[in-house]
Amino acid sequence: MCGITGWVDFKKPLVREQSVMEKMTETLSKRGPDDTNIWGKHHVLFGHKRLAVVDIEGGRQPMTRTHQESCYTICYNGELYNTEDLRKELQKRGHQFKGHSDTEVLLHSYMEWKEECIHRLNGIFAFAVWDEERDLLFAARDRLGVKPLFYSEQGTSFLFGSEIKAILAHPEVKARVDRQGLAEIFGLGPSRTPGNGVFKGIKEVRPGHAMRFSKDGLTIWRYWNVKSEEHTDSFDETVENVRFLFEDAVTRQLVSDVPVCTFLSGGVDSSAITATAAKHFEKEGKAPLHTFSIDYEDNEQYFTSSSFQPNADGPWIKKMSEAFGTVHHHCVISQKDLAAHLAEAVIVRDLPGMADVDSSLLWFCREIKKDFVVSLSGECADEIFGGYPWFHSTEDVKGFPWMRSMEERIGLLQDTWQEKLNLKEYVMSKYEETVHETPLLDRETGEEKRRRELFYLNMLWFMTTLLDRKDRMSMGASLEVRVPFADHRLVEYVWNIPWDFKMHGNREKGVFRKALEGILPNEVLYRKKSPYPKTHHPAYTKAVKQWLESLLNQKDSALHVFLDKKKLDQLIETEGASFQVPWYGQLMKGPQLIAHLAQIHTWFETYRIDIEE
């Protein structure tokens, strides 16, 4: 994986602006510590930071190639998993390659098929190509949004970058937030409306979208979405197809010129990836697979079971490691480190995030990076197979089901800001927009249509939030993380599997569990879903409480501008006792809300944000 950034201005020669591009590129250093390069020509500049994974010597970027006497230059962040298939097809069409990188194959794919090349790609990507022949920039983002791509139009300039910080490094861009951005932070955070960059004037290319910038202006279009069709396969055929698509996705994503490991929590998703990878390693005669798990200091003493998190991971991790002969690394984070990484997690994300759910992952990825460059992880399984508790609720609630306690959260704001931001209406409008966009089948029942809406909401919102988290925290550690469940072929197929198949045996993700019979140990295969682990230690609550109190001692804290002092004091004094049910997702309760508010302060202070009312 890498960091990319660029600047196009048809009204201004950019050959003397290389120092600006160097600053923009340097902000992405953690995404690519292995190499730095700047490329420029006339009215375009590209910057690239590389994390070398495939074709260490031959994959340097930005990369320029010539085809039919025209030059094309690419800067690319991602990984293609059908590189060799594309290479063979392109060679048949007369293309010659200098190395074996996927970057070169992607560039030649554009040279051959132009914008239509994106339909042929299997992978995770965000890339930009300068097409000298047509004097335009083409950019695209992968179908599920695993890799990020932000952009901004500033006068006659068009800017893009893997992260917001690259765009903010440009002298024409100011860190400003208007009412819409504030509504994103206080109403939807830590999620974001698809395409919204929160900072005024900064947007994000939505998953499955592409863009073209030329002298005629900016054009953006959607090139992919799930398609609703009748599922005609029998249950047994469905199980077989799910198994094949999943195993093929994992196997394709094990290709690397550097060592690969897996995350292992003992849940069915990470265990399925680990089992498939371990079998492949054994078949290829490779050394045993290394697996990694995270736990918290004194967790065995303070762990508290709940409907969201019924049990700790340890016993299931041990069963998996023993069953597949992995070399397991049990990483234990202290409460001190957990709290200490909260502020940095904001900078890595460029936004207030998921509190210790972020900071623990940032620390964990750095532990993995000590020995590995690439890891596979189980994100997206619950969104596509229906694993979350809200998929199984009988309540037909209008609104995002992973966002609870909205009244209480909004109530923390001062009355004037509650009136200005009108958060209930803002959040509901975003919900309705997504529901209206859901691909439906006319002949489906009302219940079936509602299920599609729920899956679509999860795919566009909750899944994207978790993919953002995984990308920023892993790249903040210079670790590449791949997500087999985001293989678009698997997502497209599972989208149309009927609910009674998905719930086979009256178990969440039943069809996927059936596909894994004989592969996973039964104890792991039928373990009730448990989310990413979290701390229950009172020392963490005390630490974030003291942190927020210290920030509030600063008279110029942005929190004083927005929050009701009495209610904020009460939140701190009670250690968030009124938020016993997770207010976001499955993990974020009172202590996480306290930490999240401290992250909001850190964001305003670090980025020196101007507020436009």
Map each language-model feature to its residues.
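A mobile, often basic/glycine-rich helix-loop segment
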Residues: 385-409
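Conserved adenosine/adenylate-binding substructure
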Residues: 43, 55-58, 73, 122-129, ...
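Hydrophobic (often cysteine-bearing) scaffold residues that line and stabilize catalytic clefts
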Residues: 17, 82, 99-102, 121, ...
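Short secondary-structure boundary/capping segments
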Residues: 306-309, 345-347, 389-398, 612-613
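Cysteine-centered catalytic environments shared across enzyme families
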Residues: 1-343, 348, 361, 517-518, ...
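Generic hydrophobic alpha-helical membrane-span motif
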Residues: 38, 148-151, 272-275, 384, ...
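Adenosyl-5′-phosphate
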Residues: 1-4, 8, 22-23, 71, ...
